[in-house]
Amino acid sequence: MQTLAQHLTSKAVNESLSQLILTLADTSKAISHAVRHGALAGVLGATEQENVQGETQKKLDIITNDMLKDALKADGTVRGLASEEEDHVVEVSANGQYLVCFDPLDGSSNIDINSLVGTIFSVLPAPAGELTETSFLQSGRNQLAAGYVLYGPSTMLALTTGQGVQLFTLHPETNEFLLTNAAMSISPDTQEFAINMSNQRFWEAPMQTYIADLLLGKIGPREKSFNMRWIAAMVGDVHRVLSRGGIFTYPTDNKDPKKPYKLRLMYEANPMALLVEQAGGKASTGYETILDIQPTQIHQRVAVILGSANEVDACLSYHGIDYSEEPTLD
């Protein structure tokens, strides 16, 4: 089996980007170690702090954020970073070539119940000139690399550098990420959907109708039965979609009119959308392709519908839009 470093060489990924990816991977090994130790190391539970989203931070949110910041500062290739746990962008190295956006511990509410969590990251080119928030406001099409690390029964890294999606598994003895799936592919059709049904009454009418039709199964207009899955961590739900197909959605809702969207564009939706498109799936807000959105702020939120291409098209048809064309992977 190829190691991650060997794989990057075989794909002719340039040296500096390879170095950055390896730094992210090495840091994820340390995060995996911290997650595994959990209560034994006294790192479970919440703090009294809130992040910029107004969400109470878990102890491991802060610990993993600091681990990634420290590693990226030492790497030398990073111009700046943006994190779910940082109010503002952080300048790293004046000579860095890349910007890194990340969610250090996606699904951290699952930590205290020993369920799935992960790290999501996105790598963008660093524009010339002074580093400001505007430097980061690039569409998802500009991503040079994206991926996530899933901390589950095995620690797994899903990665794209624009050449498909590869899956690596952390070997528990050698502590190396080894290539275990050279070409992840999302089946175009599915009978699985992932959504937080407790918000049903707050969704827009198109999504309410779409889900209602799925629940009708064979006797409904879709003429087939669907199963629902929900992990409550985007990283886990998207991993399932990449592994065996499905549709994942966190749609617009009016539960809190000031926050109609849940997921963040720059370090959740964009990297996951790139992975999904590179694996043959589609990713949309319901009204536009996620990777084509021009961001307006670092912590911008969007609706997310992604997964098996034909099922995403079916969902979008309820929104009155035909997205039947193949996604652009330039």
Swiss-Prot record:
Cofactor: Mg(2+)
Binding annotation for Mg(2+) 2: 103, 106, 268
Reactions mediated catalytically: beta-D-fructose 1,6-bisphosphate + H2O = beta-D-fructose 6-phosphate + phosphate
Covalent S-S links between cysteines: none
Binding, Mg(2+) 1: 84, 103, 105
CDD domains, per database record: FBPase
GO biological process: fructose 1,6-bisphosphate metabolic process; fructose 6-phosphate metabolic process; fructose metabolic process; gluconeogenesis; sucrose biosynthetic process
Annotated positions binding substrate: 106-109, 196, 262
Keywords carried by this UniProt record: Carbohydrate metabolism, Cytoplasm, Hydrolase, Magnesium, Metal-binding
Pathway: Carbohydrate biosynthesis; gluconeogenesis
GO CC annotation: cytosol
InterPro entries: FBPase_C_dom, FBPase_class-1, FBPase_N, FBPtase
Free-text comment on the cofactor: Binds 2 magnesium ions per subunit.
UniProt main location, coarse: cytoplasm
Subcellular location: Cytoplasm
Pfam families, sorted: FBPase, FBPase_C
E.C. numbers: 3.1.3.11
GO MF annotation list: fructose 1,6-bisphosphate 1-phosphatase activity; magnesium ion binding
Subunit structure: Homotetramer.
Family in the record: Belongs to the FBPase class 1 family.
Protein name: Fructose-1,6-bisphosphatase class 1
Organism encoding this protein: Shewanella sp. (strain MR-7)
UniProt lineage: Bacteria, Pseudomonadati, Pseudomonadota, Gammaproteobacteria, Alteromonadales
Gene name of the record: fbp
